[in-house]
Amino acid sequence: MLTLYGQERSPENSTTSTTDASDRRDETPSSEIVVRDIHAMTTTTELTRPQQRGSGGGYLSPSRSIAFSDGTTSSGENFTTVSREFNALVIAGSSMDNNSNGTNQSGGHRDVIRDERNELTRIGENDDVGDHGQVPEEDSNPWAIVPDDYNNRDGSENNIVLASSGGQNRMVTTASVQRVKREEVEAKITAWQTAKVAKINNRFKRQDAVINGWLNEQVHRANSWMKKIERKLEDRRAKAMEKTQNKVAKAQRKAEERRATAEGKRGTEVARVLEVANLMRAVGRPPAKRSFFSLS
């Protein structure tokens, strides 16, 4: 049997108003010492939670526990403790919901785990979010009430952690495989695109060379035809020039001949006139007028 000394609320303070009681719920009321006997194997003892791991390594008894008693003071304190724990659980749950989208990022995931661990440590509910990387130590509190499946629960938590780690590793591996496949597909597409573009460029270069050859051939043919026409024109010009010169020479010769003929005829007529004039002088007879019918 263990004898404990507790505190009960005095009847004098129970008659205060509801507002004053709610404002001073967390304060220590005036009390008197009451002696209670607690037996080890009864149901009226404190219901303690399994020990959680402290900051110094090793399991420590929880800082808060729910005590069941018949007194008014114990019921008020338990109601306050349950309300605080419920509020802390609600805050922790809202933090978990608000940060559920950022669990894939390492920094955000660590911050969420740290916040949840702090909240659950503050209310004494950090059994499920403890440090799974270290080996828990044995319980040193003989009065702690441990559930029957406590060891199995630790093993299940470790299995859950390992399963989550394995799932994350599988997700990372799947993401890596998908990234490698995507890079391989991108490399194939790039190689195909490069080959097609090179083929099109080579085809265009061949067509350009053919077009340039055809253009050069057409230009050469046009120049050859022009030169041929020029040569023909030169020949025709030479022939025309020669023909023109021949015609000019022939005209000149004919002109000379006609001039000589006219000159001879003139000389003959002048000599005949002079002879008739001399005869008329000698006879002394003037020239007679010619009639219309006279012959010259």
From Swiss-Prot:
Induction: Induced by mannitol, NaCl, drought, as well exogenous abscisic acid (ABA) application. Predominantly detected in bud, stem, root, flower, silique, and leaves, and enhanced dramatically in senescence leaf. One of its GO terms (biological process) is response to water deprivation. Phosphorylated by KIN11. Transmembrane segments: none annotated. Belongs to the remorin family. Collaborates with REM4.2 to positively regulate the BCTV and BSCTV susceptibility. This is Remorin 4.1. The lineage of its organism: Eukaryota, Viridiplantae, Streptophyta, Embryophyta, Tracheophyta. The gene is REM4.1.
